[in-house]
């Protein structure tokens, strides 16, 4: 899911899902099994708890002036690249990345950049079919 956070600050939270879990399964659970593979699926929603984080398309983001089509494409591409690096590192340790969240913002020149750390609390990871809580994940990953 691509979550757009405080629009005034022009920060975005991005969720890239490799497995059908979380908000994706809440929306589409009657159409797909929980944990089913998703090919680096990136979904865009506005981060708005009162409205249930409504879905928003790339075209809507452009029309609303939230970002350009090029900025959206850059965020999506960067998200998928970073996610694959994290997934590969976890796989080396016998773990499976289900989904991960990043925060992106804009540099003064308008380019998109990652503005948050890659942390265990921002991802869902499983080992041998069991969810790994963030504290345990940190211990396993850095062991």
Role assignments for model-derived ranges:
Residues 11, 15-58:
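Short, His- and charge-rich active-site/binding loops that engage polyanionic ligands
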Residues 46-78:
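Short histidine-centered catalytic/ligand-binding loop motif
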Residues 118-143:
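C-terminal helix-cap and adjacent tail motif
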Residues 52, 94, 109-110, 129:
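Detector for glycine-centered tight turns/loop "hinges" at secondary-structure junctions
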Residues 16, 97-117:
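Conserved metal-phosphate-binding beta-hairpin within the catalytic cores
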Residues 35, 40-52, 83-96, 120-123:
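Phosphate-binding core of ATP-grasp and ATP-grasp-like enzymes
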Residues 1-10, 14:
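Single conserved hydrophobic/aromatic residue that forms the stacking wall/gate
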Residues 66-98:
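A long amphipathic alpha-helix within ATP-dependent nucleotide-binding catalytic cores
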């Amino acid at each position: 899911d691509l979550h757009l956070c405080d629009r005034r600050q022009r920060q975005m939270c991005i969720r890239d899902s490799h497995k059908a879990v979380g908000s994706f399964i809440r929306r589409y659970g009657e159409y797909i099994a929980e944990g089913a593979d998703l090919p680096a699926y990136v979904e865009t929603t506005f981060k708005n708890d009162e409205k249930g984080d409504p879905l928003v398309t790339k075209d809507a983001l452009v029309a609303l002036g939230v970002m350009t089509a090029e900025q959206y494409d850059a965020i999506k591409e960067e998200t998928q690249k970073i996610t694959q690096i994290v997934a590969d590192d976890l796989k080396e340790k016998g773990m499976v990345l289900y989904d991960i969240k990043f925060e992106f913002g804009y540099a003064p020149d308008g380019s998109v950049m990652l503005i948050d750390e890659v942390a265990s609390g921002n991802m869902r990871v499983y080992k041998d079919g069991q969810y790994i809580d963030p504290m345990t994940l940190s211990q396993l990953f850095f062991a």
